[in-house]
């Protein structure tokens, strides 16, 4: 069937900000889909609220709207643009829910817009638990015994019949939000209540737990002619019971017999046909390891996290083809872009093993509940490819960037058998490592299997790794053993420590003895046809398939897995850098290991190496390719941290030199540079012992900001107000010694300003200055940023521009730099300088129209700013106002404190733009998921130091008609100022108290500032968590509260009594 000619304009709905459960995979699929539709000659309109992505670049679609993904705003765009159709299946859960909402509101019918890809009925059949169950019964496909409930009482009835454990799955939610496994009544009450709250239709499915079955996924495609194929099947190493986004996954499946494989394949194809999906779809199945009994767990009628993984694992571009199918093309008409010879109806074949390991945020959230269940907690993932499972798994472990080079964690060596048993039974993020540790300590595979039901095949593979460790240790210097260990994926780092040598020595020994990897191509067809993809992985074997060309090449290091503090913004900069390298006439080589991103799409660079970002793995590629140099400033801290090791090995680092990178990152050298340039900074010193830290803090005076040097995303930073807090920090947050000093600064309560600039060492061009709404002390990634700045005097702005130019020149920066200033009593101080791409590059590039990463790359390659048409100075400001607002994933992470501070906590960002600050803020807040009702109640409980500021805020809430609720202490200070307030009980009171008000949805906002002494037992922590669990906006910064007030005041009309007319006396009347 040829493509449809009755439609011209297609609206593509993006997936919005990055949250846990919906990360960069939709930037990748959305970008592919838009390009794919444009190739076919359609006019593409895109709406998405996330400014950090390639997808929202103006080149991706014909028209790009960065607006909130709400019914109100999307409807407005549909009425204005009048598209013929919308394609929602590439925008994740957000896109699907949006399509359902638009259809129900009647706007699609009113404007004559049809839904492409997956019909509305199919979305509802797959997402609505009741309809899905009915469909499965019609197809005679088994699902676990289950019951749809709308209330807690209905849940009790079901459990009486079926018994514990049961799994709770809320309808229409993302990444299992609100769901979980219940083993007893207490858990049932908590999880069902939370599930009903999170489901937009107040509906949960309760099903008998089949935890322990094998979890298998099939990624399938179907077209309008009913051709259907399996692109990839995957197996979770973790059995059913852990969310697939939190599971370690291998592809192709490793433990299925042919009969099992075909049985599940047929089921998957039968389901996609019954749903009538045209495009991609993901089917999750549970298989009893001891019989042929299986159950269908769920179906995602859209492109998903698994399809991004399947695309990268096979090389078969699912999203690109799903978009073509949506407009009527069929699989037998579409050429597979990888081989450029075969058609898309050939099922991919793999001659390698792929492993995916999730990347969790627990290194940032020490207190979070680490247990894994049916609710997803990972922020990102890594993928690696090898010729055997052991190699593939160990490469994935190295890719995680947790400073781990092997399947072992030192702190687990102390665990006794009982503790290991507990942690293996109840899965957490370290289970794989604990299993390896248990095998090392002689626990049998049978016992481990009994604890966690992991398949014996996988346990055997882990045992093979442990046996090889013993062999390596027993045969120091044996070349045959070295070769065997390398074939199994062992790192030089591990072998070096076992043989008591340095990593460089092991590398050199291997080189002398010819034990070096070769690079193999990913070609979708197991080398059956010739292939045109420059997409490679390393392994130890015979033939090298990566052909080095005559052209000069430049290598860019990517930023690895998405985690808090290092998000999709860095991938954006990486991709733009690669494009600029190609424009400059070089061959662009990229090294990265994140399957979700645009940068790991083989069509972006000239050569893609899917490898861990460790010194050993990167050096193998450099030895083969011999590039002109390596660019490290776009890969976040990951790449910067490799710079010194690369330079030691004689690799040329392009851009800012290593000495200058160090001058910006090393505290003492940086201070010296600032003093030399005459630029002020907050008083601060470096401590290498606890005693020193105490003395410094006494000298400069509390409050002080403490942090380790060389960090990203403000890890382990804190503001401390007195000595015992400082001691607590030094003991718990950091291990201080001469190599890892701790920085102690005077904390200034000032306005924070952020600047991004491009420097060629001589000229410095400043695209934009951003003002933060939250005062200094809240991490810049968690602050609301505003461009152009709204409250800076001309003098201060001038000072900021001068300082930026002086720093670019003085630090000899070549490429990008990002500076954070604090303005305190009208004086400008420098807090820090980052000599690399920052997380604001995409945002500023889009709003100023200055392609920062592109210009910076060309500067790095030797073309100065003047030659590119840019002068030293500040880019003219726009008359529109742009707001960048952070988005958090607290609902997914139990027991994490939501207070904002110097440690970054947000996972994503959105943008709001309009003609006034108030309107732009409104859009930014709404896009970030904060509802802004014009009336209601606000609970105010603040720390003593904030009482004065809170009075003015309370008065403004009262003026616009909000009802004020406060606990006794805060209420007293409000009453004294004649502000009417209703006193509510503190949370330790038995009677109706503050938490009850939040639980019953009777408060629209909660304003709660931190009382120091961060034990979770504190009232504040419980108030903040309760707000998150109940979807109430909880404001922990009075600056954010003021911003929301500005919006509310601009939306509501004021109501004031008339002025009294003063009585006039006769002689005041003037006669004409």
UniProtKB/Swiss-Prot annotation:
Mn(2+) 3 binds at residues 820, 832. Binds 4 Mg(2+) or Mn(2+) ions per subunit. Its EC number is 6.3.4.16, 6.3.5.5. ATP 2 binds at residues 707, 746, 752, 777-780, 820, 832. Pfam families: CPSase_L_D2, CPSase_L_D3, MGS. Residues 547-929 are annotated as: Carbamoyl phosphate synthetic domain. It is an enzyme of class 6 (ligase). Mg(2+) 3 binds at residues 820, 832. Residues 133-327, 671-861 form the ATP-grasp domain. ATP 1 binds at residues 129, 169, 175-176, 208, 210, 215, 241-243, 284, 298. Mn(2+) 1 binds at residues 284, 298. The keyword Zinc does not apply. It comes from the Bacteria. GO terms for cellular component: cytoplasm. Residues 402-546 are annotated as: Oligomerization domain. Mn(2+) 4 binds at residues 832, 834. Residues 930-1072 are annotated as: Allosteric domain. It catalyses: hydrogencarbonate + L-glutamine + 2 ATP + H2O = carbamoyl phosphate + L-glutamate + 2 ADP + phosphate + 2 H(+). Composed of two chains; the small (or glutamine) chain promotes the hydrolysis of glutamine to ammonia, which is used by the large (or ammonia) chain to synthesize carbamoyl phosphate. Tetramer of heterodimers (alpha,beta)4. Large subunit of the glutamine-dependent carbamoyl phosphate synthetase (CPSase). CPSase catalyzes the formation of carbamoyl phosphate from the ammonia moiety of glutamine, carbonate, and phosphate donated by ATP, constituting the first step of 2 biosynthetic pathways, one leading to arginine and/or urea and the other to pyrimidine nucleotides. The large subunit is composed of 2 ATP-grasp domains that are involved in binding the 2 ATP molecules needed for carbamoyl phosphate synthesis. The N-terminal ATP-grasp domain (referred to as the carboxyphosphate synthetic component) catalyzes the ATP-dependent phosphorylation of hydrogencarbonate to carboxyphosphate and the subsequent nucleophilic attack by ammonia to form a carbamate intermediate. Belongs to the CarB family. This is Carbamoyl phosphate synthase large chain. It comes from Bacillus cytotoxicus (strain DSM 22905 / CIP 110041 / 391-98 / NVH 391-98). The lineage of its organism: Bacteria, Bacillati, Bacillota, Bacilli, Bacillales.
């Amino acid at each position: 069937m040829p493509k449809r000619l009755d439609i011209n304009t297609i609206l593509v709905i993006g997936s919005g900000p990055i949250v846990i459960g919906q990360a960069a995979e939709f930037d990748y699929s959305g970008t592919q889909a838009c390009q794919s539709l444009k190739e076919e000659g359609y006019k593409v309109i895109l709406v998405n609220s996330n400014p950090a992505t390639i997808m929202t670049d103006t080149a991706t679609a014909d028209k790009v709207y960065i607006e909130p993904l709400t019914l109100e705003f999307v409807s407005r765009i549909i009425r204005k643009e009048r598209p013929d159709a919308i394609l929602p299946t590439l925008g994740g859960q957000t896109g699907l829910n949006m399509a359902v909402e638009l259809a129900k509101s009647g706007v699609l019918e009113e404007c004559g817009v049809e839904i492409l890809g997956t019909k509305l009925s199919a979305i509802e059949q797959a997402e609505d638990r009741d309809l899905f169950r009915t469909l499965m019964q019609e197809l005679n496909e088994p699902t676990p015994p289950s019951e749809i409930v709308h209330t807690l009482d209905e849940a009790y009835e079901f459990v009486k019949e079926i018994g514990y454990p049961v799994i709770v799955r809320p309808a229409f939610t993302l990444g299992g939000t609100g769901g979980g496994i219940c083993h007893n009544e207490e858990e049932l009450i908590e999880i069902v209540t939370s599930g009903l709250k999170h489901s937009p239709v107040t509906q949960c499915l309760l099903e008998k737990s089949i935890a322990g079955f094998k979890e298998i996924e099939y990624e399938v495609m179907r077209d309008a002619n009913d051709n259907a194929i399996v692109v990839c099947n995957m197996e979770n190493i973790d059995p059913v019971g852990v969310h697939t986004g939190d599971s370690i996954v291998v592809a192709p499946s490793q433990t299925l017999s042919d009969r099992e494989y075909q049985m599940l394949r047929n089921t998957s194809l039968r389901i996609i046909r019954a749903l009538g999906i045209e495009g991609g779809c993901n089917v999750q199945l549970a298989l009893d390891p001891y019989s042929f009994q299986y159950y269908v767990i769920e179906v995602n009628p859209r492109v998903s996290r698994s399809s991004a993984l399947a695309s990268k694992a096979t090389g078969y571009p699912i999203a690109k083809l799903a978009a073509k199918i949506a407009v009527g093309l069929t699989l037998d008409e579409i050429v597979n872009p990888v081989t450029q010879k075969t058609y898309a109806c050939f099922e991919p074949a793999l001659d390698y093993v792929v492993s995916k390991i999730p990347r969790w945020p627990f290194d940032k959230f020490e207190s979070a509940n680490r247990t894994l269940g049916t609710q997803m907690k990972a922020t990102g993932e890594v993928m690696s490819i090898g010729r055997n499972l052991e190699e593939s798994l160990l490469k994935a472990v190295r890719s995680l960037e947790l400073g781990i080079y092997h399947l072992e964690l030192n702190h687990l060596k102390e665990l006794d058998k009982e503790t290991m048993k507990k942690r293996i039974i109840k899965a957490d993020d370290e289970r794989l490592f604990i299993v390896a540790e248990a095998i090392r300590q002689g626990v049998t595979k049978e016992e481990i299997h009994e604890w966690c039901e992991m398949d014996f095949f996988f346990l055997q593979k882990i045992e093979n790794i442990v046996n090889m460790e013993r062999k390596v240790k027993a045969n120091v210097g044996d070349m045959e053993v070295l070769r065997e260990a390398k074939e199994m994926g062992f790192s030089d780092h591990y072998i070096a420590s076992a043989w008591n040598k340095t990593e460089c020595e092991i590398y050199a020994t291997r080189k002398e003895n010819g034990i070096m990897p070769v690079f193999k191509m990913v070609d979708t067809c197991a080398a059956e046809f010739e292939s045109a993809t420059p997409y490679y992985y390393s392994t130890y074997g015979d033939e090298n398939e990566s052909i080095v060309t005559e052209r000069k090449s430049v290598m860019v290091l990517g930023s690895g897995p998405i985690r808090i503090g290092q998000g999709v913004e860095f991938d954006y900069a990486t991709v733009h850098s690669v494009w600029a390298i190609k424009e400059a006439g070089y061959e662009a080589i990229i090294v990265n290991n994140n399957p979700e991103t645009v940068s790991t799409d083989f069509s972006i660079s000239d050569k893609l190496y899917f490898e861990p970002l460790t010194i050993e793995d990167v050096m193998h590629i450099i030895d083969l390719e011999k590039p002109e140099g390596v660019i490290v400033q776009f890969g976040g801290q990951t790449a910067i941290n490799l710079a010194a090791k690369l330079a030691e090995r004689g690799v040329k680092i392009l851009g800012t030199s290593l000495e200058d990178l160090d001058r910006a990152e090393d505290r003492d050298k940086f201070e010296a540079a600032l003093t030399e340039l005459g630029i002020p900074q907050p008083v601060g010193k470096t401590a290498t012992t606890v005693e020193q830290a105490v003395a410094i803090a006494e000298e400069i005076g509390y409050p002080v900001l403490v942090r380790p040097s060389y960090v990203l995303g403000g890890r382990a930073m804190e503001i401390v107000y007195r000595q015992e807090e400082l001691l607590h920090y030094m003991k718990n947050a950091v291990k201080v010694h001469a190599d890892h000093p701790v920085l102690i600064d005077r904390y200034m309560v000032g306005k924070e300003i952020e600047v991004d600039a491009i420097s060629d060492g001589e000229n410095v061009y400043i695209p934009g200055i951003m003002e933060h709404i939250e005062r200094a002390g809240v991490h810049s990634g968690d602050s609301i940023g505003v461009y152009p700045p709204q409250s800076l005097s001309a003098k201060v702005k001038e000072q900021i521009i001068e300082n930026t130019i002086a720093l670019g020149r003085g630090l000899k920066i070549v490429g990008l730099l990002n500076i954070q200033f604090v303005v305190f009593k009208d004086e400008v101080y420098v807090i820090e300088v980052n000599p690399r791409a920052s997380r604001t590059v995409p945002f500023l590039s889009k709003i100023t129209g200055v392609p920062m990463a592109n210009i910076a790359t060309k500067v790095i390659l030797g073309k100065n700013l003047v030659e590119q048409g840019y002068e030293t100075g500040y880019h003219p400001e726009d008359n529109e106002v742009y707001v960048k607002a952070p988005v958090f994933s607290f609902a997914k992470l139990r027991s994490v404190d939501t207070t904002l501070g110097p440690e970054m906590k947000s996972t994503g960002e959105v943008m709001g733009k309009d003609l006034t600050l108030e309107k732009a803020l409104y859009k930014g807040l709404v896009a970030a998921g904060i509802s802004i009702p014009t009336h209601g109640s606000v609970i105010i409980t603040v720390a003593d130091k904030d009482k004065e500021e809170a009075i003015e805020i309370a008065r403004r809430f009262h003026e616009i008609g909000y009802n004020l609720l406060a606990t006794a202490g805060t209420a007293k200070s409000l009453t004294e100022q004649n502000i009417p307030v209703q006193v509510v009980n503190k949370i330790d009171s038995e009677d109706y108290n503050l938490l009850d008000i939040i639980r019953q949805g009777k408060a629209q906002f909660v304003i709660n500032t931190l009382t120091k002494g961060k034990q979770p037992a504190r009232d504040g922590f419980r108030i903040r968590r309760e707000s998150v669990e109940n979807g109430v906006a909880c404001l922990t910064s009075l600056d954010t509260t003021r911003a929301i007030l500005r919006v509310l005041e601009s939306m509501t009309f004021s109501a004031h009594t008339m002025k009294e007319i003063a009585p006039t006396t006769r002689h005041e009347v003037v006669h004409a």
